Design a protein with these regions (language model features):
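Active-site metal-binding core of divalent-cation-utilizing nuclease and nuclease-like domains
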Residues: 68, 100, 112-153, 158-165
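Catalytic cores of nucleic-acid endonucleases
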Residues: 158-208
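Nuclease-adjacent, charged terminal/linker segments that flank catalytic cores
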Residues: 1-89, 94
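Charged, structured surface patches that assemble and position nucleic-acid processing machinery
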Residues: 205-222
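Acidic-and-aromatic substrate-binding clefts and catalytic sites of carbohydrate-active enzymes
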Residues: 46, 131-135, 194-196
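A short, highly charged nucleic-acid-interacting micro-segment common to nuclease
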Residues: 91-107
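Metal-dependent nuclease catalytic cores in nucleic-acid-processing enzymes
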Residues: 108-114, 176
């Protein structure tokens, strides 16, 4: 299947291109390694780094992405352009700030591992959750749609924010309601090594019923 970009020169994208770019716009950024893995999931199987680089180079030529070397000896970062966002129906687009980029990439890694394309689990982005939740509610970094339709809120904790702030965020997510029940059946904290102990301690101070709904695990590395 071929999908035409709405431009005067009408360059064309494959269905896999379109699916990958949709994912990338939703996540706002990913590493070149993550995009290469994603392309394999969306196609017939894993592809080489060289093949992934060729596909991303074509997207760059079409003005749909930018590749930037942000950190020394780390994979380049791929960010969609406004043209890619417009193709996906967005009227506005803003790249992730450098200060939040590492956090964004970890969220992309979690989605890629936990909710890979074709799996039985789905994913809601932070922006999608913001549209769902009432004003003033705590917005998680994402949410896993479990096979039974239940939502698991996902929080990425890479740096210490202090026990008080962690407790406020945790209890806020646990308290979000949907009808007569909890919107989030569980809250999953994925933590850098330096903050696992702190987040676990905050969880362990909660009442037993609330503790049972909070899972604390190491954050996947990039």
């Amino acid at each position: 299947m071929q999908l035409a970009l709405p431009t005067t020169s009408s360059p064309r994208l494959t269905e896999r291109d379109y699916s990958a770019l949709t994912w990338l716009v939703e996540q706002k950024a990913a590493t070149t390694s993550q995009v290469t893995i994603l392309l394999g999931y969306l196609g017939d199987g894993p592809i080489t780094d060289r093949r992934g680089s060729m596909i991303m180079a074509r997207w760059e030529e079409l003005g749909l992405v930018e590749r930037t070397h942000v950190w020394y000896r780390k994979p380049a970062v791929v960010t969609p352009t406004f043209e890619a966002a417009r193709l996906m129906g967005l009227a506005r687009w803003r790249k992730p700030a450098l200060g939040t980029l590492n956090h964004t990439l970890h969220a992309s890694q979690i989605r890629l591992q936990v909710c890979r394309p074709g799996s039985s689990r789905g994913w809601r982005t932070e922006e999608q959750m913001r549209a769902m939740l009432p004003a003033g509610a705590r917005i998680p970094d994402g949410a896993i749609i479990e096979t039974d339709g239940a939502l698991t809120a996902v929080e990425v904790e890479l740096t210490s924010h202090g026990r008080t702030r962690v407790r406020e965020a945790m209890t806020s997510l646990l308290a979000v309601r949907a009808g007569d029940g909890n919107l989030f059946h569980h809250v999953l904290y994925l933590c850098a090594p330096a903050v696992v102990t702190q987040v676990t301690a905050v969880r362990d101070e909660l009442p037993a019923a609330a503790q049972a709904r909070v899972v604390v695990l190491p954050c996947p590395s990039l």
